Swiss-Prot record:
Protein name, entry field: Elongation factor Tu
Native species: Leptolyngbya ectocarpi (Phormidium ectocarpi)
Binding site for GTP: N47, K48, Q49, D50
Keywords: Cytoplasm, Elongation factor, GTP-binding, Hydrolase, Nucleotide-binding, Protein biosynthesis
A Pfam family matched in the record: GTP_EFTU_D2
Function per UniProt: GTP hydrolase that promotes the GTP-dependent binding of aminoacyl-tRNA to the A-site of ribosomes during protein biosynthesis.
One GO MF term attached to the UniProt entry: GTP binding
Amino acid sequence: KNMITGAAQMDGAILVCSAADGPMPQTREHILLSKQVGVPHIVVFLNKQDQVDDEELLELVELEVRELLSSYDFPGDDIPIVAGSALKAVEALQANSSIGKGEDEWVDKIHDLVAQVDEYIPAPERDIDKPFLMAVEDVFSITGRGTVATGRIERGKVKVGEQIEIVGIRDTTQSTVTGVEMFQKTLDEGMAGDNVGVLLRGIQKEDILRGMVLAKPGSITPHTKFEAEVYVLIG
């Protein structure tokens, strides 16, 4: 459930696969889900390279991953693949948090991975000119402040002081945005693509459920019937 929810919001993904074991059944599931929910770009990290002494085995695993990606209509031949060891990199940074580039091969692998992500996954275009819409992923209360709904803004912008509607599952209600936060920083507004927490006036935690949406008043209509295409993973 959480993997599907997260993947549906991604502009790109890092697929982690063991260099020692090769693609596992869950690797195939992650690729399939990424394809079906519309993740546009993937970069691969072959982890546990420190456990592989045979360079030919590493090349074989890379080839297997590329073929698997191609079988799900990703450009397997073109996708960047970086081999390294997350554990070794963490251990090196724990021993010396000020390690710079070129000072540790395993830390350098992570720098290379981040560089490949920056280069291969383009900055997405955001629908900031459309009416505000955000699907609610989670809800919690802040003592003395009120109720916060969190999620990724699908389109438009939301500003402090604006009226919004809470739509879906229950009767539509209205509230005023009294705060917008992202990564523990207070913002004047959030926009499409941002993962934010929206503080709502006069709303109790039990008034909002995951699956509801926050929207510009009058911009959407809830429906009780719809057509859907469903993908089922066996076993």
